[in-house]
Amino acid sequence: MPAVKVKENEPFDVALRRFKRSCEKAGVLAEVRSREFYEKPTAERKRKAAAAVKRHAKKVQREQRRRERLY
């Protein structure tokens, strides 16, 4: 859990914003959402593999667009 030390004469809103940002960077909310319901190991592997395929296709598409601009 991220911790934020409140500085002297620092407004609460600013400290809260820093805390939210540190939680976002640490991935706390994403972790909570992923652990909200049990996911079978096979379903998790399948989801991660599908995400990897999607990322790869996106990368290939970006590379093709970049090559088209060069000519």
UniProtKB/Swiss-Prot annotation:
Protein name: Small ribosomal subunit protein bS21
Example GO biological process: translation
Annotated region (Disordered), positions in chain: 48-71
GO function terms (MF aspect): structural constituent of ribosome
Gene: rpsU
GO CC, one annotated term: ribosome
Basic residues bias (residue ranges): 48-59
Cross-referenced InterPro entries: Ribosomal_bS21, Ribosomal_bS21_CS, Ribosomal_bS21_sf
Species per Swiss-Prot/TrEMBL record: Pseudomonas aeruginosa (strain ATCC 15692 / DSM 22644 / CIP 104116 / JCM 14847 / LMG 12228 / 1C / PRS 101 / PAO1)
Compositional bias (Basic and acidic residues): 60-71
Assigned keywords, A-Z: Ribonucleoprotein, Ribosomal protein
Lineage: Bacteria, Pseudomonadati, Pseudomonadota, Gammaproteobacteria, Pseudomonadales
Family indicated by similarity: Belongs to the bacterial ribosomal protein bS21 family.
